[in-house]
Amino acid sequence: MPLNSPERSPEPKTSSDGTEHNDIAAALPKRIGRVYLGREKAHGPGAIVLDDFFAATAAYAKLSRSHVPERVDSAADTLILCVETPLPPSRTVLHRLRETHARAGARVYAIVLGDAGCSANAMRGCAERIKDACLSLELAWGGALIIGDAWGLERALRTAPRMGFWRRKISEGTDRLVAAARSGLPVSECQLRAGASSPIDPDDLIDVSKPIPAWTMCIRRFIDNVTR
């Protein structure tokens, strides 16, 4: 699977005696857990984006000849939380995060998927609730990828090329989240260290609330209905 390079890895820093060191080496993920809050559809958009996240994580680790994090069900040092509409209340998020038995200080990154009727503000609000839940459980918030109208693109996510027209923005957003998770950094800090030229969200959000123009979504639905 061809992958587009997400962000350059943060550069090692140099100490006063001229010795290079990477101050985030100890924070690199070794055990990644997966939490799914949604419709539990095996081939739905949430499952597809999660699978793509883990595939990209493994691919970039191999390209850089670094450790491929182990996928675990408990005692994770990093959690990937996927949330789908209808967006869950805070108490549900808290309950599921407690169930993971994640290590103290574990980093949490979220993927929030909305349907056609879910606004960017609603998805941002959900990400904020997840952040609050993390802080109350003494987990470290890493940021979130928000994806709009995911169900309108469900078939494209399964069949279209990863960096083709229909999936490109979502794939690029996923790659940016992968870069942050692999670095053990919040999304905004990872982008700053990598020298990103795109605007940096102060709330550590990657906004793909409009993955394609609205008029092309109508075409996509027409194509899916005709070829179904």
Residue spans for each PLM region:
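Short, charged N-terminal beta->alpha structural module
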Residues: 30-64
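Active-site/pore-lining binding-face segments in mid-to-C-terminal subdomains
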Residues: 125-186
